[in-house]
A protein has these predicted regions:
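Extracellular beta-strand/loop-rich repeat segments of large surface/secreted proteins
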Residues: 457-539, 545
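Substrate-binding/access-modulating region of protease and related hydrolase catalytic domains
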Residues: 23-35, 79-80, 136, 156-259, ...
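Outer-membrane translocation/initiation segment of Type V secreted surface proteins
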Residues: 32-33, 335, 347-397, 401-403, ...
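Subtilisin-like serine protease catalytic core
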Residues: 37, 58, 71-107, 112-174, ...
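Extracellular repeat-rich scaffold modules on cell surfaces
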Residues: 305-308, 315-316, 320-331, 379-450, ...
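Extracellular S/T/G-rich loop segment that most often corresponds to the catalytic His/Ser-adjacent loop
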Residues: 89, 97, 247-327, 331, ...
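Outer membrane beta-barrel transmembrane domains
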Residues: 750, 829, 840-945
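Outer membrane beta-barrel translocator domains of Type V secretion systems
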Residues: 617-814, 822, 924-945
C-alpha cells in the first residue's frame, strides 16, 4: 500500500500559526485511562494542572459506538471499505496500530522551520480523530466507526497551539484561506469525505466569503466530496465562521457559498451520558441547522502504539464519528452522490431537543443504524436515485417523509420497504422501483416509456404493497411473485406500448379507482407450485370503479422464462381483465423434434394429465417442477433442450455400448486367431488392448471404451486351436451422451475354438459376463438445471461362429470372412434419485439380438512399421428390440427410451499404423468410422510402453 510524506507549499505563516485543533475554543487535553478489564478496577483520572470549569464525565470505551447506533452497521458487515477519508488536522501517525496499512499519504503544509516534520503527528490530535473515524479495534477499544476506510492526512495545524487575538473566536484573516492546494491533493487521492476538526479563524470583511468558498468548490461541486466541520468549542449559539461557511454572507447580502451546502455537514456535540443534552463546551448549530447534526463529543481512543488509552472531548471528536458514518453510507450505497449521503445522515438523525429541525441540534443525533438503511427525509427537494445496473441489494427501508419527491434513474433496481409519506411525486425514468414486503408510497407515480419496457417499471413484491395515488404506466408494472397483493389506491392508466408483467398464479392488480388500459400483457413464468389446467383463468386487473379500454397487443412471454406450453387469450368485463389459459399439447409442440425428445414429450404429457386430475399433487415438489418445466423459454430450441434432458437417452446409449463392447471382444479374439493361423509359433499366452483406434477392437458406440483381454491358446488336434480369455472394458460417455455422464465397467470370460484347413478357417466363441453402470444426468426444468443419478447393473451371454480364408503371408495378408452371432443382455431395474420426481425409473429388461457378419481384415508390415485395416458389415436377423419403457419417478407416465433400438444394418471401418520403438515402446496412429445407426468415429495417436 502506498505511503507518502509530501511537503506542500506552506500556508501563510500568520494563518498557519492561527489554526487550532478541537474545532477552536476550549476543548479537552488528552487524558490517559486504563481499559475496563475486571477484576482490576480502572485508576482514577489524574486531574490536569488547570482543570476546565465544566469538564465532562469520562466516557465508556464504546460510547461513540453505542450512542450513534453504530453496532447495527457492524452487524450488517459495513466497514467503510473502498471509501477514503481525508483528515485535515495535525497529521496522522501512519504506523498507528489502529490505522496501520490504511494511511495512504501524509501531506504537510506547515513550516518545517517551526515544526518537527520527522514525526507524522506531534500533537496527536489528528491521529485520535482518524482513529475515531476509521480505527480498527485495539485491545479493549472496540474500534472506530468505519474500520475499513482508508485515510489521507493533510497536516495544516502547527505543533504549538496559537494565541487568541482577544475576540474569543481565534484569529481573523481576510482573502483566501490558502487551502486550495490541500483540496487538490485530496482530490488526487479520490478522497470522498474531508474531516475538519479544527478552527480558530474568522473574518469580518464580506468579500472573503466568496474567496474562501472558491477554495472549497472544486472538492464539493466538481469532485463530489463531502465536507464535515466541527462546530467549535466556544459554547456559543452559532458554529464557527468556517463551519457555517455555506450560510456566511457576502457582498450586498449575497450568499456566495450557498451552493456548498449540498456537500457540507456541521458537527455539534452531545454528552454521551445524556445524549439529549448539548455538551457544555459545544457551539450549537445556529444558522447551519439545515446541514447540522450532533454526535457524542467525549470519546476514548488508543495511542499510536496501542498500549495505552486516552479520552478527550470537543466537537473535534464528534466530527469524525459523522465522517465515519458517511463512509459507511457510501459503502452501502455506492451510487449516492455527496448530497444524498448528506441528506441520508441528516434525515435519519434522531430528533432531540425541540421537535423538528432546531437551532441547537439541527436535525438531531447521528443514528448510523438508520442511515445505512437509506434516506429518511426528502427535505431538500426531489431526490434522484441513479441506481446503476451493477448495484445489488439497494434497499431503502426507512419510512421516508418530507416535501420532496423521488426520481428513479439508472438501470438497477431500488427497493422501498417502509411506509413512505413524502409529499412529492414519484417518477420512474429508468430501471425498476420495487415496493417490497408491504412497502407504501403516498404519491402519484409516473413511469416513463422505454424502448425495452421489461427493464423499467414499478414492481409489487411481497405482502400488500400499496401506492396511495394515481399510477400512469408507460413501461411496466410487475406482479411476478407469490403472496403479493399489489394495490393502487387511486386510478391506473396503462398507455399504448406499456405492459402489465405478471406471473401465472400471481394475484391481480387491485385498483380502488378506475383503470384505463392499452398496451399488452407479458407473462413471466409461474408462481412456484402452480400448474395451469385447461380452461384456467389468470386475473390481471380488478378495478373497484370501472375498467375501460382493451389490451391492444397479444400476450407475450419473457425470454428464458417464457411459456412454451401454455397459450392465452384476453377476457374482460366492466371491472376486470383476465387471461384465459389453455394448456398446449406437449406431444404436438414436439412433433418436429428428435425421436428421443418426442418420447420425452409423451412422458411429460402423461405427467401433466395426472397433475391436472390431482390438485393435491400440484402443490408437491413434483408439481413445482412441472410448473418450472412450463416456464421453458427459448422457443422451439428451448423446448427441445428440455425434452432431450428428460428423455433418458443416456440409458439407451449405455445399453447400446454394452452390446458394442461384447462385439469388440469377439473381434479381438478373431484377430488373435488370424495371427496364430499365420504364425503358429505365436500360440500360447497372449494379451491385447481393447478400444485402440483402427485395430479392429473399436466399440463403435458414442462412448469412449477402453480395456484389455488376456488368454491362453491350447492345441486342438493337428489343425485345431482352443483357448480361454478374460477381459475388462470401461466405457465413459460424456457430451456424446447428450450432456450426461455415464460410466460402465464390464467383465467377461470367453471360450473359443478354431480349425484351419489350408488357408481356410472356422472359429466358434462362447462368452458371458456382467456389468455395473453409473449414470449422472442433468434435467432442464424451466430456467433451472437439476441433477439425477442411478446405479445399476446386469449380465450378458454371447455365442458366435465365423469362417474365412486368409490370402498372403505373415508380413502381408488379407482375410475375408462370414459369420453370425447371438447376444443376450439382462439389465436390472433402475430408479434415478433427484430431480423432484422427474428422474426416470425402468423395470428389468432383457434383449436378445442375432446378426449376420461379413468382413475383411488386412495387414502389411515394413520393418518396424505395420499397417492394419478392417471392415465389417452387421445385419440384424431378428426384428426390432422390444421397447424399453421408462416412467418418471414422481408419477406413472411411461414411454419408450428412444435411441435404444439397434439399426437393421451397419458397417465398421478402420485403419491403423503401428511401430515398435526400442524393446518396449509402441507408437500407433489409427482411425475408425461406424456407418448406420448412431454414426461414430474415433481417431487417436498414442505412444505406450
Amino acid at each position: 500500500m502506498e505511503r507518502t510524506t509530501m511537503m506542500r507549499s506552506v500556508l501563510a505563516t500568520a494563518l498557519a500559526l492561527s489554526l487550532t485543533a478541537c474545532g477552536g475554543g476550549g476543548g479537552g487535553s488528552n487524558v490517559r485511562i486504563d481499559p475496563p478489564a475486571p477484576p482490576v478496577p480502572p485508576p482514577t483520572t489524574p486531574p490536569p494542572t488547570t482543570p476546565p470549569p465544566a469538564k465532562p464525565q469520562e466516557p465508556t470505551f464504546d460510547a461513540h459506538l453505542a450512542v450513534t447506533n453504530a453496532r447495527a452497521a457492524q452487524a450488517a458487515g459495513l466497514t467503510g471499505q473502498g471509501v477514503r477519508i481525508g483528515i485535515v488536522d495535525s497529521g496522522v501517525q501512519r504506523n498507528a496500530v489502529a490505522l496501520n496499512g490504511r494511511v495512504l499519504a501524509n501531506f504537510n503544509y506547515i513550516d518545517p522551520a517551526r515544526n518537527n516534520l520527522g514525526v507524522d503527528d506531534v500533537v496527536g490530535h489528528g491521529t485520535a480523530v482518524a482513529s475515531l473515524a476509521a480505527g480498527a479495534a485495539v485491545g479493549s477499544w472496540p474500534g472506530g466507526i468505519a474500520p475499513g476506510a482508508q485515510i489521507v492526512s493533510a497536516r495544516i495545524i502547527s505543533d504549538k497551539p496559537p494565541t487568541d487575538d482577544g475576540s474569543g473566536q481565534g484569529n481573523s484573516f481576510s482573502g483566501p484561506l490558502g487551502v486550495a492546494q490541500v483540496h487538490q491533493d485530496l482530490i488526487s487521492y479520490n478522497v470522498k469525505v474531508m474531516n475538519n476538526s479544527w478552527g480558530g479563524l474568522y473574518w469580518t470583511d464580506l468579500p472573503t466569503t466568496a474567496q474562501v468558498a472558491a477554495e472549497y468548490r472544486p472538492f464539493v461541486i466538481s469532485h463530489g466530496g463531502l465536507v464535515v466541520f466541527a462546530a467549535g468549542n466556544d459554547g456559543r449559539s452559532e458554529p464557527s465562521s468556517l463551519a457555517a461557511l455555506p450560510s456566511q454572507k457576502g457582498v450586498a447580502g449575497s450568499l456566495p457559498a450557498a451552493d456548498l451546502e449540498r456537500g457540507w455537514l456541521v458537527a455539534t456535540a452531545v454528552d454521551p451520558y445524556a445524549p439529549g443534552t448539548l455538551a457544555s463546551y459545544a457551539n450549537a448549530c445556529g444558522q447551519a441547522a439545515r446541514y447540522c447534526l450532533a454526535a457524542p463529543g467525549s470519546a476514548v481512543y488508543p495511542d499510536a502504539g496501542g498500549g495505552s488509552y486516552y479520552w478527550n472531548y470537543g466537537t473535534s471528536f464528534a466530527a469524525p464519528l459523522i465522517s465515519g458514518a458517511a463512509a459507511l453510507v457510501w459503502q452501502r450505497f455506492p451510487y449516492f452522490d455527496n448530497n444524498l449521503v448528506r441528506q441520508t445522515l441528516l434525515g435519519t438523525a434522531k430528533d432531540i431537543g425541540a421537535p423538528g429541525v432546531d437551532p441547537v441540534f439541527g436535525y438531531g443525533l447521528l443514528d448510523i443504524g438508520r442511515a445505512i438503511n437509506g434516506p429518511g427525509r426528502f427535505d431538500w427537494g426531489d431526490v434522484v436515485a441513479n441506481v446503476d445496473a451493477g448495484s445489488t441489494n439497494s434497499i431503502w427501508s426507512n419510512d421516508i417523509t418530507g416535501g420532496g419527491g423521488l426520481v428513479k434513474q439508472g438501470g438497477g433496481k431500488l427497493v422501498l420497504v417502509g411506509n413512505n409519506s413524502y409529499a412529492g411525486a414519484t417518477r420512474i425514468e429508468r430501471g425498476i422501483l420495487s415496493l417490497q414486503n408491504g412497502g407504501v408510497i403516498r404519491s402519484n407515480v409516473t413511469i416513463l416509456g422505454q424502448p425495452d419496457p421489461d427493464s423499467t417499471g414499478l414492481q409489487f413484491n411481497g405482502g400488500t404493497p400499496r401506492v396511495i395515488g394515481d399510477v400512469t404506466n408507460g413501461s411496466s408494472v410487475f406482479l411476478t411473485t407469490a403472496n403479493t397483493t399489489g394495490t393502487i389506491e387511486g386510478n391506473y392508466t396503462q398507455q399504448a406500448g406499456a405492459q402489465l408483467m405478471i406471473a401465472l398464479g400471481a394475484n391481480a392488480l387491485q385498483v380502488t379507482g378506475n383503470a384505463k388500459i392499452d398496451g399488452g400483457v407479458r407473462v413471466h413464468g409461474m408462481v412456484t407450485g402452480y400448474v395451469p389446467q385447461n380452461g384456467a383463468r389468470q386475473d390481471l386487473i380488478h378495478a373497484a370503479g370501472s375498467l375501460s379500454g382493451t389490451f391492444s397487443t397479444p400476450a407475450t412471454s419473457t425470454g428464458l422464462q417464457g411459456l412454451s406450453l401454455v397459450s392465452s387469450t384476453y377476457g374482460y368485463d366492466s371491472k376486470n381483465a383476465w387471461l384465459n389459459l389453455t394448456q398446449v399439447s406437449v406431444t404436438a409442440a414436439a412433433s418436429g423434434l428428435s425421436t428421443s425428445a418426442q418420447a420425452a414429450a409423451q412422458r411429460v404429457q402423461g405427467a401433466f394429465a395426472v397433475l391436472d386430475g390431482n390438485p393435491g399433487l400440484q402443490g408437491s415438489q413434483f408439481g413445482a417442477a412441472a410448473a418450472a418445466l412450463q416456464w421453458t423459454g427459448g422457443g422451439q430450441q428451448g423446448l427441445a433442450d428440455s425434452l432431450q434432458s428428460l428423455s433418458g437417452q443416456a440409458h439407451a446409449r449405455a445399453e447400446a455400448a454394452t452390446f458394442d463392447s461384447i462385439d469388440m471382444s469377439r473381434r479381438a479374439i478373431a484377430e488373435r486367431f488370424d495371427r496364430v493361423q499365420a504364425a503358429p509359433r505365436l500360440r500360447g499366452t497372449w494379451q491385447s488392448a481393447l478400444g485402440e483406434a483402427g485395430q479392429g477392437s473399436f466399440a463403435g458406440n458414442t462412448a469412449d471404451s477402453r480395456g484389455w483381454m488376456a488368454g491362453q491358446d491350447l492345441p486342438l488336434g493337428s489343425n485345431g486351436l482352443m483357448g480361454v480369455a478374460f477381459g475388462e472394458t470401461r466405457s465413459n460417455g460424456g457430451s456424446s451422451f447428450g450432456g450426461d455422464r455415464g460410466r460402465d465397467r464390464q467383465a467377461q470370460a470367453q471360450l473359443y475354438a478354431g480349425w484351419t484347413l489350408g488357408r481356410g478357417y472356422a472359429l466358434a466363441q462362447f462368452g458371458s459376463g456382467q456389468f455395473t453402470r453409473a449414470l449422472d444426468r442433468q434435467l432442464l426444468l424451466g430456467a433451472g438445471a437439476y441433477g439425477v443419478s442411478a446405479r445399476y447393473g446386469g449380465r450378458f451371454s454371447s455365442a458366435s461362429v465365423e469362417g474365412g480364408y486368409r490370402f498372403g503371408r505373415a508380413g502381408a495378408s488379407l482375410t475375408p470372412y462370414l459369420g453370425a452371432s447371438s447376444t443376450r443382455v439382462d439389465t436390472d431395474a433402475f430408479n434415478e434419485l433427484g430431480g423432484f420426481g422427474f428422474g426416470l425409473r425402468g423395470d428389468a429388461n432383457r434383449v436378445q439380438r442375432s446378426q449376420m457378419l461379413a468382413g475383411l481384415r488386412g495387414e502389411r508390415a515394413w520393418g518396424r512399421w505395420t499397417l492394419r485395416g478392417h471392415a465389417e458389415w452387421q445385419q440384424r436377423l431378428d426384428g426390432r428390440d422390444a421397447d424399453w419403457q421408462a416412467s418418471f419417478v414422481g408419477v406413472d407416465a411411461w414411454a419408450p427410451l428412444a435411441g435404444w433400438d439397434a439399426p437393421r444394418g451397419s458397417a465398421l471401418f478402420g485403419v491403423a499404423l503401428e511401430s515398435w520403438w526400442g524393446r518396449n515402446g509402441r507408437l500407433s496412429l489409427g482411425f475408425d468410422q461406424r456407418v448406420g445407426g448412431n454414426d461414430a468415429r474415433q481417431a487417436a495417436l498414442r505412444y505406450s510402453t
